[in-house]
């Protein structure tokens, strides 16, 4: 067996009508003349929907080491519990997280993912809890998360049918360094001018309720009114958590935990985890992953790269952080 080592993953770029060019600032090689909305940093999906992932499988390729050119799924097969620890694959045997960067040049559609009750009654629907970490935001950029106080299911239905959904939604400023966790069932949309790092459960089930067709002269797409009304939660979403200096826990769900790490010209011991540790390097002027014991060769990293550290190595990994280094750590298990 090939000895385990941290896996640097190749991005999978997704064209979106609402996308832009800001992913280039994260080192993504964007094709000319095409708006790119998403960079799938970690994906292990045997299939996707046409609107979400293009209708094809999405499996991240490995960029470094002896497994270069193979997929993360291949590494799961080869290393088993050495990679996964106590973390369980999905029901289809895939990695239990989907990790992305999103560049919203325009507003994204207002949508909702299946509620626990809906998913329990529909075998083809899956929960999708997600967390947005705001990497950057233009002045005045906003997020649409949940509803204004007092909004009811009847109010939502009337707003969907009259094309006035934004009027009943809660709009909040997009603040760099803030993390917003959206339990499945939260009606939401990213606003224009926001660049986010997103960690989520690997579901592609989405019900759309508003698509900004008039605001952006977009072609009309199907709305999923009945499903959305059945799934929508009218509870107040969790308050955002803002990352301060050092290490800040910014999300803690039943599916994953997230920590924001800020360092400047320092060697940082990464936390031990019972499952694999995913690291998104959102800002750096130079960084590397090293082994305290010498168990793997040092790996140079650049801004925007995403790495999976096998569970067995999490207590041994050190981040050598250059100037102004920010990272998001996502753990499972």
Each language-model region and where it sits:
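Double-stranded beta-helix
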Residues: 144-167, 196-238, 323-333
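Short beta-strand segments in beta-sandwich/barrel cores
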Residues: 267-268, 284-290
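Ligand-binding loop in jelly-roll beta-barrel domains
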Residues: 102-107, 116, 126, 137-140, ...
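His/acidic/aromatic-lined binding-pocket segments of jelly-roll/cupin-type domains
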Residues: 99-100, 108, 130-133, 171-172, ...
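Transition-metal
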Residues: 1-151, 211-235, 258
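Short beta-strand/loop turn elements enriched in aromatics
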Residues: 134-156, 247-248, 265-275
């Amino acid at each position: 067996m090939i000895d385990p080592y941290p896996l640097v993953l190749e991005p999978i770029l997704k064209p979106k009508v609402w996308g832009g060019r800001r992913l280039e600032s994260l080192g993504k090689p964007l094709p000319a003349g095409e708006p790119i909305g998403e960079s799938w940093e970690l994906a292990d999906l045997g299939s996707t929907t046409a609107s979400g992932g293009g209708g094809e499988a999405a499996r991240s390729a490995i960029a470094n080491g002896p497994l270069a050119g193979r997929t993360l799924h291949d590494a799961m097969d080869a290393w088993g519990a050495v990679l996964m620890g106590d973390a369980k694959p999905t029901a289809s045997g895939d990695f239990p997280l989907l990790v992305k960067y999103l560049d919203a040049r325009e507003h994204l559609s207002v949508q909702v993912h299946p509620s626990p009750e809906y998913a329990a009654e529909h075998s083809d629907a899956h929960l999708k809890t997600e967390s947005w970490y705001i990497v950057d935001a233009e002045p005045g950029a906003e997020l649409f998360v949940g509803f204004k106080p007092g909004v009811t299911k009847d109010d939502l239905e009337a707003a969907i049918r009259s094309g006035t959904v934004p009027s009943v939604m809660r709009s909040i400023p997009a603040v760099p360094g803030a993390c917003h966790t959206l339990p499945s069932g939260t009606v939401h949309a990213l606003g224009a001018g926001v660049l986010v790092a997103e960690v989520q459960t690997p579901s592609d089930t989405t019900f759309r309720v508003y698509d900004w067709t008039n605001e952006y002269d977009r072609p009309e797409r199907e709305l999923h009114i009945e499903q959305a009304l059945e799934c929508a939660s009218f509870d107040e979403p969790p308050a955002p958590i803002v990352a301060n200096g050092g290490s800040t826990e910014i999300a803690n769900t039943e599916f994953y935990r997230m920590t924001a790490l800020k360092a400047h010209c320092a060697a940082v011991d990464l936390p031990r985890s019972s499952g694999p540790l995913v690291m998104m390097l959102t800002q750096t002027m130079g960084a590397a992953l090293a082994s305290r014991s010498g168990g793997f060769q040092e790996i140079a990293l650049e801004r925007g790269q995403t790495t999976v550290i096998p569970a067995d190595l999490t207590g041994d990994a050190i981040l050598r952080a250059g100037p102004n280094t920010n990272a998001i750590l996502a753990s499972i298990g």
